[in-house]
A protein has these predicted regions:
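N-terminal glycine-/serine-/threonine-rich phosphate-binding loop
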Residues: 1-73
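Conserved active-site and cofactor/substrate-binding residues in soluble primary-metabolism enzymes
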Residues: 11, 15, 38, 42-45, ...
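A conserved acidic, glycine/proline-rich C-terminal tail/linker
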Residues: 190-249
């Protein structure tokens, strides 16, 4: 199995699928091609939440603001999964989670997955603006058909790669200071505050204003604001049947203070 994920929209992913299908008979599943454009951190968050639900697969991810520059291409092996992506950190959080799931993640947070640089020459690229088609799709096909990334001549083991970590919240007695990590398509503003922080609390204050804590959006009337815990396990600022980001006046990267 192979998955594809990008910020390309349409129809660019079709060209990637064509390149892959010409090289391998892998079953292809499109995760999404609607990541926020050039937003590596948002893509990394959602990949971390989605890809662990797949059986062993090769995952081709292209969110690549550095396309056409000297940024490297990497292949990351985590558990029974291989991730092919630009070296900008986009697949590092999910690699850590996949390593956790297989019990391979040890004391050093970088242990449990292996990274190879996938070597290529600029002269091989038909376009300097579409490495998804010219670089990552062929690389993913080759990785899919190989027994292991290390069996490919183009794969060179490396300990130097771009890391990406989400910020930790500041939690103390009666107070949590977090950050908006992403806003989903419903307008739910997802924080980095773990859900257990609000367990048993109702209400809490969000930036000084009291807001009810609920397990489900529909426990309140349409248009009412709430704090809830999303399926990802983090605290969300939400509105029943409307957009929490607008109602709370927040966007990605904003600081949020919860106290009780």
């Amino acid at each position: 199995m192979m998955t594809l994920a990008s910020d390309f929209g349409s129809p660019y992913p079709a060209a990637m699928r064509g390149v892959i299908c010409a090289r391998t008979d892998a079953r292809i599943v499109d995760v999404t091609h609607e990541f926020p454009r050039q937003d590596v951190r948002a893509a990394a968050f959602w990949l971390r939440e989605v890809l662990p639900y797949f059986p062993p697969a090769t995952h081709c991810v292209v969110v690549d603001p550095g396309v056409g520059t000297d940024r490297a291409a990497v292949v990351v092996e985590a558990g029974d999964h291989c991730l092919v992506a630009p070296d900008n950190g986009v697949v590092v959080p999910v690699a850590r989670r996949l390593a956790d799931a297989t019990g391979d993640h040890e004391d050093d947070e970088t242990e449990g997955f292996d990274v190879w640089e996938y070597e290529y020459a600029d002269s091989e690229m038909a376009s300097s603006t579409f490495h998804g088609r010219d670089l990552f799709a062929p690389a993913a096909a080759a990785v899919h058909d190989a027994d292991a990334p290390g069996d490919l001549e183009r794969c060179v083991r490396t300990d130097e790669w771009v890391d990406l970590r989400f910020p930790d919240p500041e939690i103390e007695e009666g107070r949590a200071v977090g950050e908006i990590l992403v806003v989903d398509d419903f307008g739910n503003a997802v924080t980095n505050v773990p859900g257990e922080v609000v367990g048993g609390l109702d209400p809490v204050r969000v930036d000084g204003e009291e807001v009810p804590v609920r397990a489900a959006y529909a426990e309140l009337d349409a248009g009412d604001r709430l704090v809830t815990v999303g399926s990802h396990g983090n605290v969300e600022l939400a509105v029943n049947r409307s957009r929490g980001d607008r109602a709370f006046g927040v966007t990605v990267g904003d600081r949020v203070v919860l106290d009780w």
